[in-house]
């Protein structure tokens, strides 16, 4: 006896000296991703290719714990890891010829699993017993049960009750009913033969579960006992919905993850993308992506990274939501937002759309034509490049760059590097970036990052004034039948959306991003390998897809924007032709919103009353009634008049003077010539004897420009013409004087290069 007691004491001391065992250090766990309504999207594999989902003991039904102990270890709460009575009972059963019974306790089974023991050998069985005693010493019964439920084998590569309940019954463990619990309880004892992976094994499972049900009825009076004999519906349920989305989520965390995704919307939009790309296959359109966001809480409701995740020919596993590409014109609304915020424009401000140079940068419009002049809303919705670049120059490249950075756009170069090309897609952004930025407009200028998990908390940043954000959305949110030059019939679309298209350089990407109801939607079509396709035009290809999706998920209600009461906005009457404050001689007037104290609106100096000689119809030097009468004319600069002419727009010009009035001071009113090239304070590098081009836009009543360099006459040019001249090196002053004596001056530096 002393020897036996000494042996037990030695074993106990050895167990005490061993470090506390880590039950999970050899195991990794899967992740289960759910949508906002609890629908399973995906169960991932663990690092060792198992479906093993950690489930806390409180999420495992009490009945499952009772059934396990009834079936495997009735004395669980009364032993220290090893049950001598169990060994005796197993031996008698074997000697008596009855059913073979295992002598292993739950703790011993856990020890075998955790330490991967071969318990068919004497050494393995001894280590199993010692490890069981060690586990019992360091862990509570609840912790042991939890570990067992999370690592027990349930057939194939399915381990743990959490993964088994999802895969076999498509529901989390806490929702298991009694028949399902019985079916799962009997699997770990013989997982190869009793799992639910096929019909033959399901029959073996049913037989074993039937024996357990009999014992259960004898041991427990349960409200669900009457349902124990109902047919059990099971199968193998391994969904893979929203594959780009779930893989992104699972790369960040494991376990049970409840996301913001809406499986119904995800499925609907996925099917729309599949149909739409199939319809356009003949045009070489095979791939598309879309993201839908709820502006109210920034929840990502749908996330489709490609038209077909499983199609390697289109590189379908590339995530189009996070991929960075040129957005074309899709960022223009935010340049306008900054201009509105700075008071530079209002929705009906007139902007020039004429050939323009900005230093050595000479952008063109997409269609290589020019409108001459148009209001800011038209310039934005018709996506004119020149007005956008002009506004970016005025608001400042750095300010726009900062807005992009603050909105989450990852820019690895300086604002100076990107320059004015930022207005036309010169920076790369992701669909995720665009979705967050357009939602900013709907949220009063407050930026919030996208929300992927149900428990995400967001921090808002005010990046644009609420007034500027509203006016930008207002400018984009026009009645469709008021939009000119739409490439497709949009009048049938029920909803009013604030939307903008984009086409990247060389036709590689077609975009549409916009806001409708409480949603922000961004769609993209293109190729992940960067190949171009003339079909990839935002307004022709992406906009119809945008509206097809919006029609399917919207509520088909009238979405007229109303001005929130707290905004500092008012309406003012303006002269429609000029965008300036209306005067008595404006031919047409209109009302527009402006921001009191911010928006700079001046009296019109384009519309002017001039004296007309009644007899000849020519312009008189003075108003001398009754031989003259006052008439209103618009005095556009020569560059605008030239663009009008090229666009075939007939324009009523002021008539020529009746006689020479150049010495009369009253007629020196109007605009001085605007020097369009070179830019003020620019630095130009020239080789010796090389010339520079001087160009200016004079007022409508001027026909000649006289050029002076450092107060010396360099030459003269007609309106719309260029003067080539060789300048001196160093700092020089250039003066342009029109034939009515009005002048403007710039300073530049000429640097000599060999």
Where are these regions (language model features)?
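A penicillin-recognizing enzyme superfamily signal
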Residues: 259-282, 292-294, 303, 311-320, ...
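Residue-level preference for non-acidic, small/hydrophobic
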Residues: 38, 68, 110, 144, ...
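Conserved catalytic neighborhood of penicillin-recognizing serine enzymes
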Residues: 93-120, 236-240, 244-248, 296, ...
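Short pre-catalytic segments that frame enzyme active sites
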Residues: 32, 39-53, 163, 190, ...
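N-terminal type II signal-anchor transmembrane helix
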Residues: 1-36
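Active/ligand-binding-proximal structured segments within catalytic/core domains
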Residues: 59-92, 317-337
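Non-catalytic, structured segments within soluble enzyme domains
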Residues: 12-13, 99, 103-267, 271, ...
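Soluble, non-transmembrane domains of envelope/secretory-pathway proteins that act on or interact
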Residues: 1, 12, 34, 220, ...
